């Protein structure tokens, strides 16, 4: 099961003047939903989308999703806004196979490497969260013990340096549905909403094992400000091609500093090495380096 709730209103994008649902904002040849879902291997997944009724009447979002992902996907329609991601996901309960694993993908992100769900399903954990390092209170967080087990999660509160990407794994669909209902019955809310990450605290109370898996590269575009930064500083300047670096011996230190900056911004690069020849033809040097990489 791969469950993708996109029933939120996206108020900040509406207020910023965007006319289409944020998942369908386009950057070049791709829409934001493409960028996010491309980070997850959806082959052999039971794809379930949760959308709002007005997204269908105003934007034909159901037809767009079927054009992208096939006629056999499941589209669950909400009559309006829900009380949060957990409530939205529970609308799809009858379509979730209770006996197989469930992944929830909340979009608005680009990360690497690509998630292969079969690999995660081979773990012994009852649940798993993808994480990245951060200290911003905009995100949810997982606190780990000395054996890398999650002992607590929190929404919009920094309790560790392990922020949640927005990919959530439950060992079975039943495990999610039963505990999601309990969360709502106990009225466990953050900012008056039912978020997914605090749901894991209920599983932890029951002595179930929750793990994390870190991603190497992470970009977020869940708010207009984050989207503009992504568009103008990641995609526009770099696109799909990595930066190539090379230097003579006098520029080694500068090159290494630049590599640290690129790494800190999760920007891909290729280090073509260093030449001892001050009069080097760099175009020829890089061509030879590329040829060597292709051959080897």
Feature map (PLM): residue ranges:
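N-terminal beta1-alpha1 ligand-phosphate binding loop
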Residues: 6-11, 241-261
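A short beta-strand-loop structural module common to alpha/beta enzyme folds
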Residues: 268-280
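Conserved core of the sugar-phosphate nucleotidyltransferase
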Residues: 111-187
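N-terminal small/polar loop signature for handling phosphorylated ligands or for N-terminal nucleophile
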Residues: 280-296
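Short beta-strand-to-loop acidic/aromatic patch adjacent to the donor-nucleotide binding site
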Residues: 99-110
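A short, conserved beta-strand element in the Rossmann-like catalytic core
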Residues: 55-56, 109-112
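Conserved N-terminal catalytic core of the sugar/cofactor nucleotidyltransferase
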Residues: 1-4, 12-14, 18-19, 25-26, ...
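Conserved alpha/beta core of the MobA/IspD/sugar-nucleotide pyrophosphorylase nucleotidyltransferase superfamily
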Residues: 2, 163-239
